[in-house]
Curated annotation (Swiss-Prot):
Record PANTHER family: 30S RIBOSOMAL PROTEIN S16 (PTHR12919), SMALL RIBOSOMAL SUBUNIT PROTEIN BS16M (PTHR12919:SF20)
GO biological process, alphabetically ordered: translation
Keywords, in A-Z order: Ribonucleoprotein, Ribosomal protein
Name of the protein: Small ribosomal subunit protein bS16
One protein family per Pfam: Ribosomal_S16
Organism: Vesicomyosocius okutanii subsp. Calyptogena okutanii (strain HA)
Family annotation (SUPFAM superfamilies): Ribosomal protein S16
UniProt cross-references to NCBIfam families, sorted A to Z: S16
Length: 96
């Protein structure tokens, strides 16, 4: 079965994730079928946090690929950027 999930890259304490279509039996960071985008949780300045190729994502889901829970959240955020801004506001209010 094909799964759409995150594959970790980057350096120690500086994570960077690729959104990939891969066989569910493979290890998290092993070879994948296709890279569909990326997610950088630690952005600075003008760096782009999230990129997803929606056409390819739709293609793989039409072929029966299962999407992981975290990637579902990221797709929602990608389609509606206000979700991310709201989450940041809530987290900063809790830290006060």
């Amino acid at each position: 079965m094909v799964k759409i999930r995150l594959a970790r890259g980057g350096a120690k304490k500086k994570p960077f994730y690729s959104i990939v279509a891969t066989d569910s039996r493979r290890r998290r960071d092993s070879a994948y079928i296709e890279r569909l985008g990326y997610f950088n949780p630690v952005t600075h300045g003008q760096e782009v946090r999230l990129i997803i190729e929606e056409a390819r994502l739709a293609y793989w889901t039409s072929k029966g690929a299962q999407i992981s829970d975290r990637v579902k959240q990221l797709v929602k955020e990608f389609k509606d950027p206000l979700i991310r801004e709201r989450d940041i506001a809530v987290k900063s209010a809790k830290n006060l």
